[in-house]
């Protein structure tokens, strides 16, 4: 299978992209929008095998993480940056027609892209593990917190009330929450792309989303009313 890697100049930095297969195949390409913000494209490599069916599978690291990592520059970390990045990447790779898959934060970006920009050439859209409303998301995460021990619930509530997200009790509680409801530890038997070390965009995540999965700062503007 042919793997093509490259970089697109963007805002004075570089956006890394990866193409499995050929864009000239008999099926329209599928572009993948990863989660986070700041989670990298790595886990999408499990979909490389779809390229054997004659469809290019395109993933990329959104600015601020992975091979597109940028140190600092908190002014960049908003949906506008990543929205325009997607628009520019389509132009750069000549993706006039394509299928779109957005996972988690990538799904939020996909929804905003479709609602606000009404792009042409989108043949289909797949939304995975995502939502249209940060407010509803936070409500559901807090419902799941209630299934945790009282000690963990208290530690999380205290952190949210005080704004101190460095307390050891909170950090331990949040780690347990993530293992239970968000992201387990990769096993030795998992595909290499899931076990590979990656440069997570912590700054972009905290700035654009918040300190954790259940306390969104709401810099992301929910398109749900639209």
Each language-model region and where it sits:
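Conserved small/polar residues in nucleotide/adenosyl-binding loops
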Residues: 220-226
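Conserved hydrolase catalytic core segment
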Residues: 97-139
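Glycine-rich, phosphate-binding/catalytic loops in enzymes
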Residues: 46-51, 74-77, 118, 142-145
């Amino acid at each position: 299978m042919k793997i093509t890697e490259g970089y697109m100049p963007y805002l004075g930095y570089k956006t890394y992209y990866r193409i499995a297969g050929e864009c000239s195949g008999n099926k329209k390409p599928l572009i993948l929008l990863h989660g986070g913000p700041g989670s990298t494209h790595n886990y999408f490599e499990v979909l490389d095998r779809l390229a054997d069916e004659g469809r290019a599978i395109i993933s990329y690291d959104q600015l601020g993480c992975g091979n597109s990592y940028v140190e600092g520059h908190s002014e960049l970390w908003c949906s506008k940056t990543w929205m325009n990045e997607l628009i520019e990447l389509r132009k750069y790779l000549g993706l006039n027609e394509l299928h779109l898959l957005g996972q988690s934060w990538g799904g939020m970006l996909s929804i905003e892209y479709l609602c606000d920009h009404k792009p042409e050439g989108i043949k289909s859209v797949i939304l995975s593990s995502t939502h249209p409303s940060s407010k509803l998301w936070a409500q559901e995460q807090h419902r799941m917190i209630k299934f945790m021990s009282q000690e963990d619930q208290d530690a999380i509530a205290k952190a949210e009330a005080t704004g101190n997200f460095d307390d050891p009790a909170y950090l331990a509680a949040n780690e347990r929450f993530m293992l239970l409801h968000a992201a387990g530890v990769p096993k030795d038997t998992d595909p290499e792309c899931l076990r590979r070390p990656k440069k997570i965009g912590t700054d972009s995540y905290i700035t654009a989303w918040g300190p954790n999965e259940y306390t969104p700062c709401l810099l992301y503007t929910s398109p749900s009313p639209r």
